[in-house]
UniProtKB/Swiss-Prot annotation:
Superkingdom: Viruses
Protein's name according to its UniProt entry: Uncharacterized protein ORF54
Gene: ORF54
Source organism of the structure: Ictalurid herpesvirus 1 (strain Auburn)
Length: 607
């Protein structure tokens, strides 16, 4: 299965500091895994797109790189007794979404070799993992008759119950074909036999998020036991700051009532509240002011900046320090918090005389009746930006996507996430970046962000692109599953012009959440009513004259929606006309002959 990436990233982003959709994000794995489950097919495809090293043939290249990938896990999150479970797809019809993508890609020599030698490569790899002392279980998906597996216990400690006995029952019961669903089925089965064991499913396939939510919505929150998803995504690679993320990942989280009580007190703050005299004519800043300014319960990521500030202001008398605190409070009230304040603060600490002069003028202007957002935009456009003084060698080996340090997206963010020193550029931030920062300041000023939003985001940026997800279903979980499916899964027919922004807005609608929670997603239901009611909650409007085939299209949307959700719930539906598909020559097609003919049946209104 597959899902459009942006929608899942939006769900993750909006779950960093709050459980809005049934997802709890962790920036670390607590404890060592008892079992680690991999989508072996996805791993192999990733290795096959790595260029073959000189002097290696395709076979050696594939085995060497794949073995390195798995042994890295054995040295980090595993112990000598950890069971590695490698799941490989069984035989299946080619999906609608995958068919066109495969036609666009030219296979690499390694990929061609892999496709013709899957069984031999799997056997060789499992044997080498045994030699490395890794207890390994290799499973191939259901192919219409059976599943198959191979187990080697390595040289480590054998699990408490013989794995063969566990697998005999699993193979007899499981009819899953695809590796991503098989991973969940295996995690559930393993958790029943080994209660309390920590199971880690590792993947970068975005559908793991909605499929897990769908599964627990149907089976109950305890179904997967102590299972954690290790999800790899470049959204947590430390190169994009909060202002850009709020825009790119469609922020929809809101403060709690207790947060709003604190935010409403900003208007009452006085400089004396945060000033503590030192008895020598000077003083220090206290009272959690920096926590509020940086929007973080933990200010250790900003310790280097704060230490420099303390050194810079050590010689100031009480009145001068009170003046700085007055400016900081003005920043709080204007919404210049989080990444906005971090950027202001870095420029305040800059040693360049012209930058310091610009900062001084900005501080003075903030004490006037001038438009604060215009002041912020002018200030940022008149000062230089920063980039982290990083090199690829300084980065974690877990980085496997492009490394780009863009001042517009980071502005020295690496100083907080990786402890990297930063250096000044010769240019200011772009107009787009400044507009994004001003927009974020308005959101802060309107109390639309929870407390600790920036701190939580910074903590996730220290994961080198890895985050750990636990499922804890809430009222909106089913709505999130429907939203992800409508964004575009491999087997799902989507609604024309219904984009990610509108889908995320649906998740803010209590009526949509309530409707999803009460709906049974089965082809036996009259689903067209559900789809039309959902469309009425968006800006979509039917074009006139109405396309006579639109009702049939909407019916197919419902049927494929049911198929996707039931697949995620491990109900193994069979693709066919009941679910809106025709299967011909091992290819799955929608019953709608030409879905693209319906791309203009809706218009976007202004609602």
């Amino acid at each position: 299965m597959g899902i459009r990436k942006k929608l899942v990233q939006s769900l993750l982003f909006n779950s960093i500091s709050q459980n809005n959709f049934g997802l709890i994000l962790q920036n670390n794995l607590f404890g060592k895994a008892d079992a680690v489950i991999f989508d072996h097919m996805l791993v192999m495809h990733s290795m096959c797109f790595v260029p073959i090293s000189p002097g290696m043939d395709a076979r050696e290249h594939i085995i060497t790189n794949t073995l390195n990938f798995y042994t890295r896990y054995s040295k980090t999150i595993a112990t000598a007794s950890t069971l590695f479970i490698l799941c490989e797809d069984g035989l299946q019809s080619v999906k609608p979404a995958v068919r066109d993508k495969r036609n666009e890609h030219v296979p690499t020599p390694a990929l061609v070799y892999f496709k013709h030698h899957k069984a031999e490569l799997a056997k060789a790899l499992v044997e080498k993992m045994q030699m490395e002392g890794i207890c390994t279980l290799f499973i191939t998906g259901y192919n219409g008759r059976s599943m198959s597996y191979q187990y080697m216990n390595g040289t480590g400690k054998r699990p408490a119950v013989p794995v063969e006995l566990v697998m005999d029952r699993f193979v007899a019961d499981c009819k899953e074909v695809e590796a991503d669903m098989m991973m969940y089925a295996m995690a559930a089965h393993y958790s029943r036999r080994y209660p309390g064991h920590l199971v880690v499913i590792t993947t970068r396939d975005t559908d793991v998020v909605p499929s897990g939510l769908a599964l627990l919505a149907d089976k109950g929150p305890e179904y997967l036991g102590n299972t954690v998803i290790e999800f790899k995504t470049p959204m947590f690679n430390g190169l994009k700051d909060h202002d850009r993320a709020v825009s790119d990942f469609l922020h929809v989280s809101n403060p709690t009532n207790s947060h709003k009580l604190i935010l409403n007190r900003f208007a009452q703050f006085t400089p004396q509240r945060f000033f503590k005299a030192d008895g020598f004519g000077g003083g220090t800043i206290e009272g959690g002011l920096f926590n509020l300014l940086f929007d973080s319960t933990n200010i250790s990521p900003f310790a280097a900046l704060i230490d420099k500030f303390v050194q810079t202001t050590a010689s100031l008398d009480a009145e001068e320090l009170l003046g700085i605190i007055r400016f900081f409070i003005a920043c709080l009230r204007a919404g210049f918090r989080g990444t906005i304040f971090r950027r202001i603060f870095m420029r305040y600490l800059d040693d360049d005389p012209s930058t310091r002069e610009t900062v001084t003028k900005f501080m003075g202007a903030m004490d006037t009746a001038a438009d604060k957002y215009a002041l912020l935009g002018d200030f940022l456009s008149q000062t230089n930006s920063y980039i982290a003084n990083r090199t690829i060698k300084q980065l974690s080996p877990d980085y496997d996507w492009d490394i780009i340090d863009d001042a517009d997206q980071s502005d020295g963010l690496g100083n907080c996430t990786l402890g990297q020193p930063y250096m000044v550029t010769t240019t200011s931030l772009s107009n787009r970046c400044i507009k994004g920062l001003v927009s974020l300041a308005k959101m802060y000023n309107e109390h639309r962000l929870p407390l600790d939003s920036y701190g939580s985001y910074i903590r996730m940026q220290t994961t080198h692109g890895h985050c750990y997800v636990r499922f804890a279903p809430v009222k909106a979980s089913t709505a999130a599953v429907v939203a992800c499916t409508l964004a575009g899964a491999d087997y799902n027919l989507t609604i024309p012009k219904l984009g990610s922004v509108q889908i995320m807005n649906l998740l803010l609608n209590p009526d949509f959440i309530e409707m999803c929670e009460k709906t049974r997603f089965s082809v036996e239901e009259h689903g067209a009513e559900f789809i039309w009611k959902m469309i009425s909650m968006t800006k979509l409007r039917k074009k006139t004259p109405v396309d006579p085939g639109l009702d049939g299209y909407i019916d197919c949307v419902w049927r494929t929606l049911c198929y996707t959700i039931q697949t995620w719930q491990l109900k193994t539906p069979v693709a066919g006309p009941d679910y809106g598909f025709n299967v011909r020559d091992s290819m799955v097609y929608f019953v709608i002959d030409d879905p693209s003919a319906f791309k203009n049946v809706f218009t976007l209104g202004r609602k």
